């Protein structure tokens, strides 16, 4: 094995799938012409002159630049980064023109419009008054956008362009929320409901109040006092978009237009005791801010963080190793539980057919187990000692967790009374609130909430599958969850079993209490990778800086109504979402309706989360979003956010699947693509020429058909037979994932490793855009650029890494170069490679640079501060013509190949068509 950098020879193939990946002809994108607008006075000739003046390369004679070529891999060359390369989910600096800015589209209004060095669809043309210009619309043909330019999946939404005087602080860079926190499906809002209906586009907002598991990984400003100014009528919070009146003594609400008094303490600094400039206050400068709440926002003192651990101790849990793994993980995570003010409390209940309470003797190291056999009417066997302070009882808790598995090591009880255990845990903490964290390896089979195995074989693949297998089998779990919500109690589930667990029913516990259901099929402690994944995710789950006893309310300008809410919470009233605890790794979607004609050039939305921090402080996190309006369909389409729209349609498809059937959910998604293409063809294609391609769409929406097509092939919706627990878990994940994770789940990321640039897998300098000297900042591992999810972009001798958001697949092609196998695995024999769930051997940089770089890439992908998911690695060896017969007949390897291949969503899989075939079928549907 050599430490030198090896250049792996690439065999030349005269024919093969890889030939399909050739780039398009240079004139392929000449159809990208701006949509003609009769009222527009900003002509193409004028645009051409400005482009030439700016000396932007690649501008054609018509003034419209060709489509960017970086989305396609050139023959013999590794795929390169887009010209504007940045992390799409990190906050970006905004332009100084009142516009959402470079972080939201790559170019300010004065720079290159669609198809140039920025995003292939955003130029500013339409004047909405007061100096603001909306995005111009450029058309592309989906049938010629093959392979699809997937780099655009990592681009920011279209820029939000506002009048120069839209903010109280002129040219504020931080007044409008970034999409990491608050984004709309439409960055230009229709002025009336008929226009919205005509567009066939949804109007909804995506709220992600927290985008990191730990507070220190966020940069949200906090007010330095408890002065909060709110509108007397609509109760909106003062924000960067209000206007001042009467020499700054009053402010006009940007939601309902009411004049309100500014508090006398608004320009007084309590810390220094000095008068301060009110314009320096964070709530007037920042779109996302946290207020420290005064006492009137508290119904009681902020609650401490409370965890009740409900642990399966039945024979299945003992034999699989779940009980021992969980208690050891909790023990190792005690220091990670947020406990800054030493008020955290914990309790433990072991569950088989009985309830095993753990009582701590105050001040003593010993504990005792109190067994309650009456599961019909569960009760607390002791008035005290069950729920104890973590800090004060640390030694006893540590000893309990060390000894806990031995208490049940010979247990042969096959019962699992989850329902009674939940009721007991709720009774224990209902007067305080907190979390019930359940670890189960067994289907609840005794007591209230008893479940039985459903007959999957008789309904799998049929229209009634969803109602028979995905509907809750027992109403107890939803009704109990609603009770928990009113008591400020969240339920989280960690389900580990190779047998049926009825995830569809149990997940109601988490859905209505703002929790989450984590599913680990075929988990066993005999597999190191299984233990590592469960332990890592449980530990990160316990370490989250969760918010407590929280509510979320979203407000909008006059004329808007919040009509539907999606996510894991419970609607306490028509517009108030209740969260006993607020997780930091989930997202929420609110659909809006337009109730009256909007006559203002800008409308506003505000989301507020009233909560208690895990260190005992009552706060309100407020997020603000301002959007321009338009009465023109062209403006609506030019500023549509395709990723947010995909998120919306995902929620609607989940709703359709659970209320109707899986086939209807798939048909719904395809019908939405057809609707949008029909509207675009009839209303927005220049001249509406008969015989024009039916697959024309705006460049900023050209990934939407791909995403919705791939969604129909997702585990949650696909027509093939899928175990109901797996399907239910997939539906849960889709319904709560933030947009970055959602998109990766729908369209997995594939990296080509055998031909990656020399810089990949090694530390590089991540540019700091705020550093004027360009010295750079954070040292980070460089990742390869993704390639399309299709075998057409693969080589028969390649090495590929697939990231589907939940797992990683390392695909070693059957004709791989032996030297690559040697450098990566330490053997030249391809069939000596350990396949399946495993880890790569660890070689130092000197021993094998290639092995080191690949492991660094995998480590970087796994490294995330916004999710608890730990991605297991599966090594897959592809088929080859000289493969030994005994290898070809291995069922596990065949299943693994099929699983990994299902991530190549652009290809034909089973009965599902390829993306190319899908587009062909769309032509007839759109032309009808």
From Swiss-Prot:
Membrane topology: Peripheral membrane protein
Annotated region (Zinc finger-like), positions in chain: 231-256
Localization (cell): Cytoplasm; Cytoplasmic vesicle, COPII-coated vesicle membrane; Endoplasmic reticulum membrane; Golgi apparatus membrane
Region (Disordered): 1-104
Bias-annotated ranges (Low complexity): 27-48, 69-86
Position of the signal peptide: none
GO molecular function, one term: SNARE binding
Cited function: Component of the coat protein complex II (COPII) which promotes the formation of transport vesicles from the endoplasmic reticulum (ER). The coat has two main functions, the physical deformation of the endoplasmic reticulum membrane into vesicles and the selection of cargo molecules.
Subunit field text: The COPII coat is composed of at least 5 proteins: the SEC23/24 complex, the SEC13/31 complex, and the protein SAR1. Golgi apparatus membrane; Peripheral membrane protein; Cytoplasmic side.
Family of this protein: Belongs to the SEC23/SEC24 family. SEC24 subfamily.
The protein's name: Protein transport protein SEC24
Organism: Candida albicans (strain SC5314 / ATCC MYA-2876) (Yeast)
Gene this chain is encoded by: SEC24
């Amino acid at each position: 094995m050599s430490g030198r950098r090896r250049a792996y020879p690439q065999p030349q193939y005269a024919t093969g799938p890889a030939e399909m990946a050739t780039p398009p002809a240079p004139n392929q994108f000449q159809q990208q012409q701006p949509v003609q607008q009769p009222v527009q006075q900003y002509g193409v000739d004028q645009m051409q002159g400005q482009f030439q003046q700016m000396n932007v390369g690649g501008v054609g004679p018509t003034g419209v630049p060709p489509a960017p070529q970086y989305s396609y891999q050139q023959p013999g060359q590794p795929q390169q980064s887009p010209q504007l390369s940045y992390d799409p989910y990190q906050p970006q600096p905004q332009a100084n023109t009142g516009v959402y800015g470079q972080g939201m589209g790559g170019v300010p209004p004065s720079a290159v419009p669609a198809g140039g060095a920025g995003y292939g669809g955003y130029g500013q043309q339409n004047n909405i008054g007061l100096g603001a210009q909306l995005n111009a619309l450029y058309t592309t043909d989906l049938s010629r956008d093959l392979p699809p330019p997937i780099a655009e999946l990592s681009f920011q939404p279209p820029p939000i362009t506002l009048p120069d005087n839209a903010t109280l602080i002129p040219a504020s860079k931080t007044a409008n929320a970034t999409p990491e926190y608050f984004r709309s499906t439409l960055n230009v809002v229709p002025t009336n409901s008929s226009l919205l209906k005509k567009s066939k586009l949804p109007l909804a907002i995506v709220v992600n109040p927290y985008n990191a598991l730990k507070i220190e990984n966020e940069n949200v400003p906090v007010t330095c006092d408890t002065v909060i100014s709110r509108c007397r009528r609509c109760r909106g919070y003062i924000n960067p978009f209000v206007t001042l009146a009467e020499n700054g003594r009053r402010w006009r609400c940007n939601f309902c237009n009411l004049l309100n008094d500014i508090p006398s303490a608004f320009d007084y600094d309590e810390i220094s005791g000095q008068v301060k400039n009110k314009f320096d206050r964070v709530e007037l400068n920042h779109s996302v801010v946290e207020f420290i709440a005064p006492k009137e926002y508290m119904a009681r003192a902020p609650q401490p963080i409370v965890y009740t651990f409900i642990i399966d101790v039945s024979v299945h849990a003992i034999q699989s190793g779940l009980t021992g793994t969980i208690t050891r993980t909790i023990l190792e995570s005690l220091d990670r539980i947020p406990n800054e003010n030493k008020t955290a409390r914990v309790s433990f209940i072991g569950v088989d057919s009985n309830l095993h309470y753990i009582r701590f003797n105050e001040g003593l190291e010993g504990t005792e187990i109190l067994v309650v056999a009456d599961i019909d009417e569960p009760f607390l066997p002791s008035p005290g000692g069950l729920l104890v302070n973590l800090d004060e009882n640390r030694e006893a808790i540590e000893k309990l967790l060390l000894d806990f598995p031995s208490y049940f090591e010979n247990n042969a009880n096959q019962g699992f009374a989850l329902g009674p255990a939940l009721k007991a845990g709720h009774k224990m903490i209902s007067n305080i609130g907190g979390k019930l964290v359940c670890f189960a390896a067994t289907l609840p089979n005794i007591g209230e909430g008893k479940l039985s195995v459903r007959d999957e074989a008789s309904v799998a693949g049929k229209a009634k599958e969803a109602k028979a297998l995905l509907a809750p089998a027992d109403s107890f779990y939803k009704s109990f969850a609603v009770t928990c919500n009113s008591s400020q109690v969240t339920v989280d589930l960690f389900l580990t079993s190779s047998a049926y667990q009825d995830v569809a029913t149990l997940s109601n516990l988490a859905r209505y209490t703002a929790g989450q259901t984590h599913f680990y099929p075929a988990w066993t402690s005999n597999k190191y990778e299984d233990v590592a994944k469960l332990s890592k995710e449980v530990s990160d789950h316990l370490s989250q800086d969760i918010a407590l006893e929280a509510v979320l309310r979203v407000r909008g300008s006059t004329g808007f109504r919040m009509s539907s809410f999606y996510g894991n919470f419970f609607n306490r009233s028509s517009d108030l979402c209740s969260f006993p605890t607020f997780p930091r790794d989930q997202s929420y979607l609110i659909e809006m309706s337009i109730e009256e004609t909007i006559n203002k050039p800008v409308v506003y939305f505000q989301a507020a989360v009233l909560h208690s921090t895990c260190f005992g402080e009552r706060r309100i996190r407020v997020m603000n979003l301002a959007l321009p309006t338009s009465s023109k369909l062209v403006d609506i389409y030019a500023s549509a956010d395709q990723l947010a729209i995909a998120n919306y349609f995902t929620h609607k498809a989940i709703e359709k699947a659970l209320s109707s059937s899986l086939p209807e959910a798939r048909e719904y998604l395809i019908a939405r693509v057809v609707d949008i293409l029909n509207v675009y063809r009839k209303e927005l294609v220049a001249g509406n020429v008969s015989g024009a391609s039916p697959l024309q769409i705006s460049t900023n929406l050209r990934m939407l058909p791909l995403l919705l097509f791939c969604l129909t092939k997702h585990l949650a919706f696909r027509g093939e037979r899928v175990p109901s627990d797996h399907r239910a878990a997939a539906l849960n994940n889709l319904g709560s994932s933030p947009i970055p994770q959602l998109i990766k789940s729908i369209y997995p990321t594939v990296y080509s490793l055998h031909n990656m640039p020399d810089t990949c897998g090694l530390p590089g300098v991540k540019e700091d855009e705020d550093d004027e000297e360009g010295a750079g900042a954070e040292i980070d591992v460089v990742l390869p650029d993704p390639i399309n999810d299709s075998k057409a972009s693969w080589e028969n001798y390649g090495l590929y890494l697939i990231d589907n958001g939940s797992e990683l697949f390392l695909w070693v092609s059957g004709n791989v170069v032996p030297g690559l196998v040697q450098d990566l695995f330490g053997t030249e024999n391809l069939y000596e490679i350990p396949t399946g769930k495993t880890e790569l051997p660890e070689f130092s940089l000197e021993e094998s640079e290639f092995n080191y770089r690949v492991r660094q890439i995998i480590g970087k992908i796994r490294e995330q501060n916004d999710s608890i998911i730990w991605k297991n690695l599966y090594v897959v060896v592809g088929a080859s013509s000289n493969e030994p017969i005994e290898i070809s007949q291995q069922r596990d390897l065949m299943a693994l190949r099929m699983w990994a291949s299902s991530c190549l969503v652009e290809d034909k899989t089973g009965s599902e068509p390829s993306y190319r075939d899908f587009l062909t079928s769309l032509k007839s549907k759109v032309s009808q």
